[in-house]
Amino acid sequence: FLIKNITRSILISYQHGGLYGQEKHFIPEKSERMISDHFISWGWKEKKAFPLPMKISKLPLKKNNNNKYCLFVTWSQTYAYFSYGNNPELTPELSMNPTLGLLRYVSKKIPTILRPQPIPGRDDHVWRDKEFYGKIKKIKIDNHEKNFEFMAAHAKFVIINHFNTTALETLSMNIPTLVFCDKNLINFNSKASKFLLKLIKAK
C-alpha cells in the first residue's frame, strides 16, 4: 500500500527517547528524520518538527529516605550498534566488562538490584544482561513487576551504564544518579554539548 501510494502519503515519525538528537553520527535517527514529512519531538526544533510538551512524572521529587538498595540499570549494545557485524565479541569487551567490574564492586557495599532495560521486540538485551551479569551472586535481578519510576524512587541511588533517557528521568526526579559509560562511545553534536555543559555545571 505504501509503495503504491508513496507520493500521496504523509509519513510522520516520532521521537522515542529524551536524548534523541544528541549524537553527531547516529544513522537510524538521521534516516528517520530524513524520510519523514513531519517529526514529532518534545525537545528538538527543526522545520519538520511538531513540538510536544515534556513528560511530567506524577511521582513527587525524591526526598532523603532510608532506602538501602542501589538500582543498577543496564543497557548493553548489540554488535549492530557498533556496526561490526563480524565482531560480536566487541559488545562484552567495550560495554559489558567495565559494567561487570563496577557492579561487582557496588554489590559488595550495598544490596543491588539489576534492572536490564527492556526494549520492545529486542529481548536480546534482557537475556544477555541477565546471563552475563548473573555471574555475580550478590545481586538481585529485577523482574519488572514494578515500573521504573517506582523502583528508582525507592532506591538510595541509581547507576546507569549508558547516558540515555533513563538518566534524564532519574535526574528530573531528584534521585542521586551515576552515569557510568565510556564517553568515547558517544560523539555529541554541538547543540547537545551546550545542554550537557549546563547539566554538568548544575548544582
Describe each region flagged by the PLM:
Residues 35, 43-51, 65, 74, ...:
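Catalytic binding pocket for nucleotide-activated donors in carbohydrate/polymer assembly enzymes
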Residues 21-27, 48-51, 60-63, 82, ...:
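Short, charged, surface-exposed secondary-structure boundary motifs
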Residues 2-4, 29, 123-135, 189-196:
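Short, aromatic/basic amphipathic alpha-helical patches
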Residues 52-132:
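Conserved catalytic-core segment of nucleotide-activated headgroup transferases in glycan assembly
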